Amino acid sequence: MLLGSLLAQYEEELIAVGEEAESLSFAYRALKNWTFTDFVLALQKEVEEEDQTLLLSIFEQLKHHVPAQYIIGSAEFCGHVFTVDERVLIPRPETEELVALILEENDEEALRVLDIGTGSGAIAISIALARPNWQIQASDVSEEALALAHENAQQLEAVVSFKSSDVLDDLEGPYDLIVSNPPYISRDDVEEVGANVLASEPHLALFADRDGYAIYEKIARQAPSVLTPEAKVYLEIGYKQGNKVKELFQKAFPDKQVRVLKDQFGQDRMVVVDNGSH
């Protein structure tokens, strides 16, 4: 059978179970290490038996809601390729916007930075590579996630120190900047989560108690004691959480400015705590 015909057959079945059809060709090309041109040229060729087996394997995993990034074992973030598996969340494009904002609003001056809930290490490592003179620390409550983040730092030659901690329980600071993309989905909103996310990605990194606000509340309680006077806090939030998270941090930092910023899709996505000037 021609590759194009086999892909079309599998893609139709993936759509029927609510998966994105493009994930199949994306994963296949990645595992074959093909360019897009290689892929296009192969569409009208017969599929070798070995490749039929590979395609079937990818299809079966996608059909059972395994994300394509887990199948290929990597995800791109801020121009870098990170190893990902079931130990960590797959980095999202929205989080790239958070990193870009931090780099845009903070110049080359050396800062002490903490990434809370680092997961794959995507935020901390991307910042470390862009600002090599900053002192970057990254924490997570999951030892498995920290192990993978450490692997990513080594692979990408980023200088980041990793620490096991539940938010700031085992951290002392002082820090000039805290960034976090914490678990923020309420357990009541489980129906809003995609099937592949729910089936494969770690729930510890997805869901938070107290309607999704538990980690924000803990950061707001603990951060004032470990931050320098000029320090800033950058948070990713759920699209419905802007007002509540802003209120939490305005109470925790009454003398600072708290901003809610939108992502590229026009949804509330980031909260920034600083001394003003923006």
Segments (PLM) and residue ranges:
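SAM-dependent Rossmann-like transferase core, predominantly class I methyltransferases
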Residues: 57-131, 136-151, 272
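Alpha-helical elements of Rossmann-like donor-binding domains used by nucleotide-donor carbohydrate transfer enzymes
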Residues: 9, 26, 54-57, 97, ...
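A general structural signal for well-ordered alpha-helical segments in protein cores
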Residues: 7, 24-27, 55, 68, ...
